[in-house]
């Protein structure tokens, strides 16, 4: 099987990444990665992303301790989107929820908050 890393299609230097819990398949979050983040994710076994708001590379959990250990990386049929299947430590969401998708379009919160965000980032 060929390594698809060289053929990934980045838009403005970024590729979308969907993140799922490897056991439950719950969607945990969505983020972007640049080539360096994808390379670091593959070499370290832990999820790395590129923050558009901070304009920098980041390792998920570097401040909170809520790491994402990579179980598998899948590539979509167009090679322009990645799916990380992970073992999540702690919360995936910086708001203290297991998933960033914790509310409906109507604003109803459908997941319990696991941690107070102030506690997550006061380490």
UniProtKB/Swiss-Prot annotation:
Binding site for Zn(2+): 77, 93, 100
Cofactor info, note text: Binds 1 Mg(2+) ion per subunit.
Keywords assigned: Amino-acid biosynthesis, Cytoplasm, Histidine biosynthesis, Hydrolase, Magnesium, Metal-binding, Zinc
Named cofactor requirement(s): Mg(2+); Zn(2+)
Record-listed Mg(2+) binding positions: 76, 78, 80
Localization, UniProt: Cytoplasm
Gene Ontology cellular component list: cytoplasm
GO MF annotation list: magnesium ion binding; phosphoribosyl-AMP cyclohydrolase activity; zinc ion binding
A Gene Ontology biological process term: L-histidine biosynthetic process
Cytoplasm recorded as keyword: yes
Job of this protein: Catalyzes the hydrolysis of the adenine ring of phosphoribosyl-AMP.
Subunit structure: Homodimer.
Family: Belongs to the PRA-CH family.
Protein name as catalogued: Phosphoribosyl-AMP cyclohydrolase
Native source species: Methanocorpusculum labreanum (strain ATCC 43576 / DSM 4855 / Z)
Gene it is expressed from: hisI
